[in-house]
Amino acid sequence: MPAEIKPSAPAEPETPTKSKPKSSSSSHGKPALARVTLLDGSLLDVSIDRKAIGRDVINSICAGLNLIEKDYFGLTYETPTDPRTWLDLEKPVSKFFRTDTWPLTFAVKFYPPEPSQLKEDITRYHLCLQVRNDILEGRLPCTFVTHALLGSYLVQSEMGDYDAEEMPTRAYLKDFKIAPNQTAELEDKVMDLHKTHKGQSPAEAELHYLENAKKLAMYGVDLHPAKDSEGVDIMLGVCASGLLVYRDKLRINRFAWPKILKISYKRHHFYIKIRPGEFEQYESTIGFKLANHRAAKKLWKSCVEHHTFFRLMTPEPVSKSKMFPVFGSTYRYKGRTQAESTNTPVDRTPPKFNRTLSGARLTSRSMDALALAEKEKVARKSSTLDHRGDRNADGDAHSRSPIKNKKEKDADKEAKLREKKQKEKEEKERKEREKRELEEKKKAEKAAKAALAAGAAAGAAVNGNDELNDSNKSDKSSGRRGVGIFSSGRKSKSGSPSKDGKDKSGKDKDKEVGRLGLVVTSGLGDNQQDQNLDEAARNAAKNRGSTTPGVTRQYEYAVDNDGNTSPTRKSYTPGGFRYDQDPNSRKSGADGQEQLSPTSQQKKIGLAFNYAPGNENALKETAEKLKAGQLSPRTQDKLNRGQLSPKSRAKLLQDPLLSPTTRAKLQGSAVDAAAVPLSDSQKRSYSPTKGPQGYSSGAPGSYKPISDPTADFLESQRYNKEPGYVGPSKADVAAGLAGAAGSKKPGSPTKTGKGAPGAAAAAAAGAAGAAAAAAKPKKRRVKIMVITSKFDPSTKRIDAENGSIEHSTGILDPATGLIDTKYGVIDPKKGTLEALNTKTGKKEVFQGDVDGKTGNLHLVSGVADPKTGRLDDTLGQIVCITPQDNPVVELTVITSRIDPATGKIDTVNGDVERSLGVLNLDTGLLDTKYGEINTRTGELKAIDPKSGKIVVSKNVKVDPGTGQITILGIVDPKTNKIDPNQGRLIEVGQQIDPIVEVTSLAGKFDSKRNIIDPKTAQVETSGGQFDPKAGKIDTKYGQIDLVKHTITFNDPKSGKTVTRDIKIEPTTGQIVLKNQVNPKNNKPDKDYARIISLRIVQQRVDPATKAPITEVSASKDKDIVVDPKSNQIWVPTGATDPATKEQQYISSSVDPKTGYVITIYGYLDPKTNEIKKQTKLDPNTIKIEPTSGKIYTATGEVDQATGEPLYAATQVDPESGEVYTKLARVDPKTGKIVIVRILLISKTDERGRPEEIDPSTCEIDPVSGRVLKFFNKTVYVYNMIDPVTGEIVQVDPNDPRFAGARTTVTHTMTLTGEIDPVTGRIKSEYGDIDPNTGDIDPATAVTDPVTGKLILNYAQIDPSHFGKQAQVQTTTETVPITRQQFFDGVKHISKGALRRDSEGSSDDDMTAQYGADQVNEILIGSPAGQAGGKLGKPVSTPTVVKTTTKQVLTKNIDGVTHNVEEEVRNLGTGEVTYSTQEHKADATPTDLSGAYVTATAVTTRTATTHEDLGKNAKTEQLEEKTVATTRTHDPNKQQQRVVTQEVKTTATVTSGDQYQRRDSVSSTSSGDSGTPIDGPYDGASVVRTDNQKSPLFTTSATTGPHVESTRVVLGEDTPGFSGHGEIISTQTVSSKTRTVETITYKTERDGIVETRVEQKITIQSDGDPIDHDKALAEAIQEATAMNPDMTVEKIEIQQQTQ
């Protein structure tokens, strides 16, 4: 905060607009309060006119901060849909806020590309704060090296020079927050780099910080999520240079501002018109799709503003249309541009501003405070800045760049001499200084006490509203102003009591500390300034004697004769550091002499923020206390600094005030954060010692992301990302605070300055809570039913019977217990609802009552009319909340006799019953009316009807294939004994919503016939909600308990909640309620009764109209049929029997014994007008798979593709425990069940929706229909080995550089293992693997035993290094290489010579050896055929040859058998060739596992050759697909793997005699490693030379033009290879750019026969000069990519002439 600020009333800020007279109204006359979060995290309250525009507010803020270059800054605010929206500075601020307090955030909007061009240090200081926040919040990703470098400047700015005595280890860095996730390795690197920055002032460190930060890729980029034209998720970034496009965290395109002609948006689309290129004729328009029109407009406005600010000299004026209306947006940026800001002269003295809060920490040589007489000596010793008398006053006075300026030679020599003298006097001065410090200590203590007493009296008389422009007076202001660039924010009012300050309150001590921070270089005269510094030194000495840690250090900086105090006018080397440079070498310039700052004429002392105050012993004790767990970054920071009083500490730990997902503070049920003033302990602070926070949730009912999408996009780019790190909100520990809520309140301060023992208990509780926060429970979905009706104030009763019912879904946060719903945030414990008051426009908390009997929430205030959406005081609401922990599933039960021959239940003649069950996903238990069935162990827990005890029987069988449950032996209802010949077949259907369709029949009750009089009967349909755990159903008539046979409702007479018994009619299973309210007199009538039929439906729609149940009109109730004899209520389903055309009806029955609801189907007989119950198998609602007997039940849905009805069946996988539902349709032709979708119920998202799986990606048993492999994920990762570094890199297969190159390998991995539901990673023996990228979590990664390196990607796994080599021996044949195989790339090389990454995907899978290893020689278009074809048509018909190779590998006790069957089919001629091979090998004697392995690999290769004889061009396309399946049957386990590999290659060959044309052949030897290949010079494709002894000098007899060439020889052994070698084959393929010669030969050495492959690559050009270095690099890169195992043996560069 600058010290030179003229006092002004905050209510009258500096604005360029004229303020209108205030209204006489009190609401408009009272000034508004804008609560602004500054860049250091502190809060600033600004009083301003309500009619003020945004520019007035930012002018007031910049005036208070003493900023002149204010055009780079802006204000942001939060909306329900966007957590970071820029405030329009030309509109009134009151337009964007409805509350009295305007929450705003001060931020940098336009990032200058060159920070050194900023004119003032204070502007750079605030830019540094913004960049620091961007790094810590994840918007600016950095690498390890960048984090270390920037962190070293952070440490230099805060702590000064490195001191080996005080900083022997990296312990002094433990309080620094350098990176979002920092490690010990990073701190070591920071410590090493910190040593190299000796002598840099804080201002210099700031400029170094910015000069390195501007080089980051995401510096100043404003990201917006979008989709491209193909629907792929991308991010659009707006920056100073133009528009950037990102996809999968990589920048894939850039549109510079000069290349863009026009930007526009329409609805949710954003368009840019591109200027045509040099060879383009028309303009092109590119469109992007955004989430909504608001997002599109936000992106458009950002582009307009950035383009105007950085590219234009002045803003574009808004054109005024006179005659024609303007349909587009007239928005234009009206602020000053960068050019105007740069050209505006600054005619003031550089402001002096504080980078400190208070105190001094005298532990560094460069920061020691001495007497004023010794100030100059300390300056010489601690800084590389030279004496003022030796400066050149006019040498580059305006240079602020860290680039080293040239010095005059004479000045350099003198500087060198002075440096030598300075070193000689160093030891002597240190001893003198220590002696003086001891003498001045007592004097400083007395002076400090007197100054503090006077300051306290002055601070007590300050008005709180003066804080905006007067930082020297108010303690409130000192809590907000004056911090170092990397400080942790403002100091709270609750300071930490010191040992000798026990008689002072924390508040008084904080005032003292706040005043101490304002005595530094405040623009006074030199004498007064020296006095202030002397007083600061004495106060520092006083602090040195106490145990209160000082929070500042002194530093020196240069002041010129004009009073310019900019500390950045020192020249230094760019970049700031070098790894190979001596740390002491920074004292010298380029020629070894000391650097000089030409503008510095005088040394001054300032105060810099000390980031790790206090003695080391106290810090170590604090670290030991917090070792068991970690509090939130805010709490831990203040505890380490001792800045929390015991009272504040107890309040913070006892109240879970911080929401884990929002920045806002929750009080009770989330009181509006804007309406409640925040205390100091709740104010946000972005700092290096504070973790990032998420964004606050907005208005109720809007489900928006809890974090910034920009942060989500950049999250994975963070250095050393933690395992399972899901976003910034993870740093918060609300659970930890909640865990500490029960701790005792710490007592008053003791003599030692510590709290009562309760503080230790609170810290321990917070640590335990932090551990609980690490395992944060997942949010769960709950069902909500709301009954809205009239509220009677006299009886305080809500008329629920005549109310409207609405069903919805809410999200329960287990950490807070709050439920986020469309109505607002509900606290079920306190009975409150936080919702938006439509009358006041504010969020308010409405108090309700929680019914102790039903648990429902009754609200009589804050209730909105469902029709209008406005609050209505005459309405009341009953909110019923039901958890959805386990899914409710339909059960189809067939009870019949057991066939003694097959042991199966007769499903055709059995009785069918439809009921419900609750399936526990974790244990596999199925709760049914027949008992609790364990689907894994086959146990049945049921209640014995005689004894009433739980009996466990094992007469349950679960079919592992179909998942059907069979109960053998059931109780005969007649004899009440178990009949072993009877059984039940239970089939689990689909998961349904616990929504109840309540159909009631009310009227005069006939007690004799036990029915309702048909004349007075009235039918009504409504909704209900079913709680399967409690067995209760909430309806508008009350809460029905099906187990206890009771109903709980609100008595209309007394208005109290009462519980009455209900009667369940045994014949119909319907509920009979007597003594109901008669609608005629609106009073209870003993003769008036109501019969209720409950049906739990799978959809909340009417079967005929598909309308929601709550909207079914009374006219639809006429279709309901009531049985006149039994009053059974039948509801039409809308379906008919296709054979008899009878209408289908449905009813329900409640089992009186178990309370389970049973669904009954029936058909209406048109003759008798009666409904017949369907007790047998109904083919319209149930389908049976003929092969497996699996039962599928109708869902009521239809297939979107075919329109046929869908049937469902649910199954529990016996091995993995996964629960999945198969949705299928019946093929009308074959009658077979065809699976359409698979829903994985056991894997749900945050809202409870099951994961949907495509059946085509699953392996389904054709017999039983069981999904054998459905949760394994097949991932396509494209990798290649970097020929320079040897590392595996991932490439984009669509990149033109790789699409046609032979170096591209499509690597398919099969990752098998349990999927972590939180992180989504697959757990394997090599670590937790990300299925999307193949990256392995570093925390669980293993080390390669051979290389010793950590395996961080699945492709880096070499199974042979882990002893997993295949125990198979086969006979191999060496086949001469062909031209076709050369086009195929590296596939022709044996596995011994080349190990592709695809082997790593199937480590112990034997198909890796046989998947695509069998390559057959296919000669397409021989040279003779080509020569003869020249006389025919210019263009020939394409030749297509399809080769199918099937390999079956069987390993058993007898050994290994390998069968190969091959079919070569010429699709043009119809010629088919078959061939078979068989290889056998004996079993390995060491293999005693007894495993039986069957591996099948089917490879399909389609080669298409298109020959253009007129152009002598041939285009060959090769597509290959290999599907390898391995099944391992082991006594202990069964495993199956499937590997699919696809390779596509396209090559264009120009053959014939083109080599004879010499006139227009271009030299294209670079940039196209796989581009056009010409034919050999003699017309032959393959040249073979036999029986040559020296393979290194084998040449081919080709003739061609004499060229300048570079030859690269690749081989596996040394150049001096000795031995007898026999040439097997040679091949030479030439083009106009290169010649590749491949030699295959075998040699015998020491009785061992080896096969070697050697390649010679010659780079050539047709007579043109060649770039040897470039050509050589390309040759090595291509050859190494083709065969990574080969090495370069010899490089020859020759000059050949004709």
Swiss-Prot record:
Q: Which InterPro entries match?
A: Band_4.1_C, Band_41_domain, FA, FERM/acyl-CoA-bd_prot_sf, FERM_2, FERM_central, FERM_CS, FERM_domain
Q: Where is the FERM domain?
A: 32-314
Which tissues does the record link to its expression? Answer: At onset of germ band retraction, expression is seen in epidermis, hindgut and foregut. During retraction, expression extends to tracheal branches and salivary glands.
Top-rank lineage group of the source organism: Eukaryota
Q: Which GO terms describe its biological process?
A: actomyosin structure organization; adult somatic muscle development; cell adhesion involved in heart morphogenesis; cell-cell junction organization; dorsal closure; embryo development ending in birth or egg hatching; establishment of glial blood-brain barrier; heart process
Which parts of this chain are annotated as the region C-terminal (CTD)?
1286-1698
In which residue ranges is the amino acid composition biased (Low complexity)? 12-27, 449-461, 1561-1571
Q: Where is the composition biased (Basic and acidic residues)?
A: 374-448, 499-514, 579-589, 618-627, 1509-1532
Its Gene Ontology cellular component terms are: cytoskeleton; plasma membrane; septate junction; smooth septate junction
Q: Which residues carry this modification: Phosphothreonine?
A: 689, 1407
Quick one: where is this thing mainly located?
Answer: other
Q: Enumerate the residue ranges of region (Hydrophilic).
A: 317-434
Q: Where is this region: Disordered?
A: 1-31, 335-361, 374-710, 1509-1599
Q: Polar residues bias: where?
A: 562-571, 594-603, 684-696, 1533-1554, 1584-1599
Q: Where in the cell is it found?
A: Cell junction, Septate junction
Q: What does this protein do?
A: An integral component of the septate junction. May play a role in cell-cell interactions that are necessary for proper development. Vital for embryonic development.
Which PANTHER family does the record associate with it? 4.1 G PROTEIN, PROTEIN 4.1 HOMOLOG
Quote the protein name from its UniProt record. Answer: Protein 4.1 homolog
Q: In the UniProt record, what gene is named as encoding this protein?
A: cora
